[in-house]
Amino acid sequence: MNAVTFLTRTRRPGRIGLTDILSWVWLIGGTLAVLIPVVWAAMSSLKPEAEITRFPPSLLPRAAVQVEVPGYDRPLSLWTVTIDGMEREMAMVRRVGIKAQMVDPANPGPPVSVDTREMSPVQKLTIATQNFTDPLTQFNFLTFLKNSVFVTVVATVLTLIVNAMAAFALSKYRFRGEKAIFVLIISTLMIPLTVVMVPAYLVIVGVGLVDNLWGVIIPTVATPTGVFLLRQYMLTIPDELIEAARVDAASEFRIFWRIILPLTAPALAVLAIFSVLWRWNDFLWPLIVLSSRENFTLQVGLNAFQGEFSVQWHYILAMTFLSLAPVTVVFLFLQRYITTGIAGTGMK
């Protein structure tokens, strides 16, 4: 079945019913609700700073045309004005209220007063590449990016190892209090982050990891979601495989490394995707732990573009769009594991 046939199929072959129309409206509306903000942010990241706040806004990145006029020490913006019913292109010298002083750029003479309601800016398609180059060269954005990659990769690897070990013990070993421990781990999902944030910070202070990337990584390694997801998947692995390995004198670690982990690959891929999204987008905990600019992660570094009296939206939008690229690539490469991994765990 090709994509067109799949998208245009109906509940009753050859007939379009009300439910089909409602389904299409719902799906199209949901798709637009997701795509429009992303497309708007992408287009706005290419606009010059002045164009981002211009009203009425435009989707395409445009900028006012600037012209050099003899007798003026700076370029003047070009406008289309209506004078005596005729449209002309003139350069604006200054603007006071609803009146603007305009001159002819080709033959400058005394400024002419024009009503601002009778003029519109001359614009051209412009891509503001400085929105991307300035943060990379002037604001240590590459350092923020490197720190985020380090935190994300290391935290994800440790999360997979620690959660897989805990899930292996809870799924394949029988001991007193096994279910109680599992329930206790799952119950931590109901505890808000703000409740444990202060105790976690005091622990980080006690071990001397404040303003250290390891202070961001270590407290986030063990996750109840990861333990639950991997345990549920490991329960589907036959115990006979483990017993056969023990008969062949395989150690518990070898069983875990050579048998359990390969068979749990779909669930590990799902947890890896979740972990990358969590670590890459984490803002509050790195903001609390880190204080030196050279240790900032990407999300904390983006906050530096927001001052007390001004916000550099052109830089924020450009760097936000750029920061979406790594997690998008990870998701595209691992998305085929999501359905099989979650289906195997029984997770809703």
Where on the chain are the PLM-derived regions?
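A structural signal for multi-pass alpha-helical bundles of membrane permease subunits
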Residues: V4, R11, D20-K348
